[in-house]
């Protein structure tokens, strides 16, 4: 099957300035992400960035770059700019990999593309089971609940579904009903065009989760359990050191 990978790589980062160019064992982080994307079998891979130094690093590694504006409010808006500049047809399948995921398994990049291709929805994503109580109650770990057909009912930073009887007695064990959302998305290009035409939703602004805009406007997001659990993403200097050690 045919699909395109777009990797947004914003240079500015409050917790880790110049994040895409941080060195991981001799290569910039964005190059590690690019290499993982290549292993997925994507037909085309584009790094979308607002900074010339990131563009130079990607081009030096033989990658394709699309320069984007620096004032986008979300990663999806940056994707939409690339979709328009590259004039992708509405049925083109696009997988969005974050530029701070140097350990993302190539298999799940392809998985989300294949799931979208076999679904009637315009958007697809992945999740993994939560086994750790600390993660279950951590608002930085986004949870998702699905319906019987594998479509998202809701995403939240809260602990959903709330196991009333279990949690009334103890929060040390969590059962097997919780899923953590992974920030990888597949879209049809036409869906991205529609998404950015919608006003931000109240739920999205409360939870600070832009995927809630899709549910607010009555659209569906296909969710599947990831074939592999992705490694550590990089948000902080501590994350960066962990990834360096794991990839050494």
UniProtKB/Swiss-Prot annotation:
Full protein name: 3-deoxy-manno-octulosonate cytidylyltransferase
CDD domains, sorted: CMP-KDO-Synthetase
An annotated Gene Ontology molecular function: 3-deoxy-manno-octulosonate cytidylyltransferase activity
Keywords: Cytoplasm, Lipopolysaccharide biosynthesis, Nucleotidyltransferase, Transferase
Gene Ontology CC: one annotated term: cytosol
Catalytic activity: 3-deoxy-alpha-D-manno-oct-2-ulosonate + CTP = CMP-3-deoxy-beta-D-manno-octulosonate + diphosphate
Biological role stated in the UniProt entry: Activates KDO (a required 8-carbon sugar) for incorporation into bacterial lipopolysaccharide in Gram-negative bacteria.
Major place of residence: cytoplasm
Enzyme class: transferase
Family: Belongs to the KdsB family.
Pathway(s) annotated for this protein in UniProt: Nucleotide-sugar biosynthesis; CMP-3-deoxy-D-manno-octulosonate biosynthesis; CMP-3-deoxy-D-manno-octulosonate from 3-deoxy-D-manno-octulosonate and CTP: step 1/1; Bacterial outer membrane biogenesis; lipopolysaccharide biosynthesis
BP-aspect Gene Ontology terms: CMP-keto-3-deoxy-D-manno-octulosonic acid biosynthetic process; lipopolysaccharide biosynthetic process
InterPro entries: Cytidylyl_trans, KdsB, Nucleotide-diphossugar_trans
Entry's localization field: Cytoplasm
Xref: SUPFAM superfamilies: Nucleotide-diphospho-sugar transferases
EC number, UniProt record: 2.7.7.38
């Amino acid at each position: 099957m045919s699909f395109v990978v777009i990797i947004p790589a914003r240079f500015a980062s409050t917790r880790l300035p110049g994040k895409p160019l941080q060195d991981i064992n001799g290569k910039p982080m964005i190059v590690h992400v690019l290499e993982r994307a290549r292993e997925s079998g994507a037909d085309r891979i584009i790094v979308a960035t607002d900074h010339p130094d990131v563009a130079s690093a990607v081009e030096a590694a033989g990658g394709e770059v699309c320069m984007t504006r620096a004032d986008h409010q979300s990663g999806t808006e940056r994707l939409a700019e690339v979709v328009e500049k590259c004039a992708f047809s509405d049925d083109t399948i696009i997988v969005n990999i974050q530029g701070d995921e140097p350990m993302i398994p190539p298999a799940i990049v392809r998985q989300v593309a294949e799931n979208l291709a076999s679904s009637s929805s315009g958007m697809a994503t992945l999740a993994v089971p939560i086994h750790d109580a600390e993660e279950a109650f951590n608002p930085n770990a986004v949870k998702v609940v699905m319906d019987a057909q594998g479509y998202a009912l809701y995403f939240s930073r809260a602990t959903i579904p709330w196991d009333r009887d279990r949690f009334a007695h103890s929060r040390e064990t969590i059962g097997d009903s919780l899923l953590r959302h992974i920030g990888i998305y597949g879209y049809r290009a036409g869906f991205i065009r529609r998404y950015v035409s919608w006003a931000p939703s109240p739920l999205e602004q409360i939870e600070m989760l832009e995927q809630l805009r899709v549910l607010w406007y009555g659209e569906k997001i296909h969710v599947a359990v990831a074939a592999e659990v992705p490694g550590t993403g990089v948000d902080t200097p501590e994350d960066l050191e962990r990834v360096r050690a794991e990839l050494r």
